[in-house]
Amino acid sequence: MTQQTMSFQAEVKQLLHLMIHSLYSNKEIFLRELVSNASDAADKLRFEALENNALYESDPNLRIRLSFDKAARTITIDDNGIGMSRDEAIANLGTIARSGTKEFFSKLSGDQQKDAALIGQFGVGFYSGFIVADRITVETRRAGLPASEGVRWESAGEGDFQVDTIERAARGTTITLHLREGEDELLSSYRLKSIVQKYSDHVALPILMKKEEWDQEKGEMVEKDEDETINQASALWTRAKSEVTDEQYKQFYQHVAHDHQDPLAWTHNRVEGRSEYTQLLFVPSHAPFDLWNRDYRGGLKLYVKRVFIMDDAEQLLPQYLRFIKGVVDSSDLPLNVSREILQESRDVKAIREGVTKRALSMLEELANAEDDAGKEKYKTFWSAFGQVLKEGVGEDHANRERVAKLLRFASTHGDTDAQDVALADYVARMKPEQTKIYYVTADTWQAAKNSPHLEVFRKKGVEVLLLTDRVDEWMLSFLHEFDGKPLASVARGDLDLGALNDDEKKAQEETGEAMKPVVDKMKETLGEKVKDVRVTFRLTDSPSCLVADDNDMSGYLQRMLKAAGQSAPSFQPILEINPEHPLVKALKADGADFGDWCHLLFDQALLAEGGALEDPASFVKRTNALLLSRAA
């Protein structure tokens, strides 16, 4: 049998049904698609009229008109663009996935393509009208053809259509949607305006509707003869920065972010190269109430050639920058056929990287401001979004160092809970012999400030960062060093604050040897509660403290995981005792109440670091017994 090449067969009725009811997730999209087609028709006329001005037919003011008829249950979209001939109507409307725009675009020269702002590329947008209509009537005449060569195209979306030649004086296209049952809510001026303003507000053509006014006698809105433009018909981001005032940027932010307050900062630029796009990004001055909700949708508004595609385009910004508001307008982003989903590609990745770098540059300018007003702005930003930005240390490996420079913490340098210390500030204040950046984590600033682990640091004048945000422990698992200086927890491992002289070293060794019987007996008494017991010289005022081994999870992180309902490995801390404290000095390994004192020192250390006692009743009973024995 000889090999044959065959064409796939398609049941057109089924294909139309599948496309109409499966391609689009939101029925409002039909108006965006039809307005986009009308905009393309105007652009085509402009280009052809460059060589033949007579195509304007004494009507050079291009526009789109939107109207509805409640009695007839129809919505009409009318444009005075290029229009279609009979053959074009049959080819473009009668062939699924044929794009007249795409074919027209392919005929343009390179320079003309760069200047064109044509939107359609799939040839399926027209059929979105069948989402809300059970019949569509199109009347059209191509510019330059006589009125006798008008065309009427009509279909019920069932796999066939009818075409007639009609008399049509007006150039352009009129699309009438005969609505399905249950779609009457669209027969409202307010409803249609809201859809246009959501999706097509920045289409270059004015979109006109008849004005409505309240009629007191009839008790309803009545249509007037006067037209009104219902879209902005311009996109602020397409203008040069020098042409836009600060007040206009602020007003646009309030419009796009639905926020009544001014932004802290903004950045506006056009990127040219393999991926061409314009970005206008804003930093809000306050966090939305639902920023930490599981369902919070962050991201930018995505436009393609000034037509709104989607809110919350999460693919264009990493999660830790979800608070950034603004728009990205691209001319060549890959979308799926319904233009509702952004497809992953090298272009999307390049735009994401570019937008991320631009957003970080904007934050760096805020953070590095020298004037008081600029510093105050960054304080406001950090208070609102600092915890979110910390997520970037773990999420964005490529920009980790840039994000780290933007971080701010409270520290022992100032006696306030203000998070205003940058890591660079800390490094600049380090002692000559200091090799590490020290920090302590706790539930609250008060608990961190009063942690017994800080005692020796205060004595030696070494600054310690006070970390109290829930994200800090997770962040530190990714941030191991800054400017070549390792970050070290004051509550983990052995403490090394610099070299000791021979006399100090000998004294500590002798003290440790003398305390060995007590330490061994404490290990035996506390058993599984502790991983080890050892003498420490990090304490000056407290009798004991708990530390984690170098490779173990900290007690604070374990408590945080439990509070979040997650499983955490069992925590065995190391109990360190201060040999110079009177309570420790009074311990005798053979004393009758030695066990009670051991448990009391452990429980006190646990409470001091913000932990919770497993058996509070026993702690109270033991404490009372020891107090009574001392009183006696």
From Swiss-Prot:
GO terms for cellular component: cytoplasm. Residues 340-559 are annotated as: B. CDD domains: HATPase_Hsp90-like. InterPro entries: HATPase_C_sf, Heat_shock_protein_90_CS, HSP90_C, Hsp90_fam, Hsp90_N, Ribosomal_Su5_D2-typ_SF. Residues 1-339 are annotated as: A. Keywords: ATP-binding, Chaperone, Cytoplasm, Nucleotide-binding, Stress response. GO terms for molecular function: ATP binding; ATP hydrolysis activity; ATP-dependent protein folding chaperone; unfolded protein binding. It comes from the Bacteria. Residues 560-632 are annotated as: C. It is found in: Cytoplasm. Belongs to the heat shock protein 90 family. This is Chaperone protein HtpG. It comes from Burkholderia mallei (strain ATCC 23344). The gene is htpG.
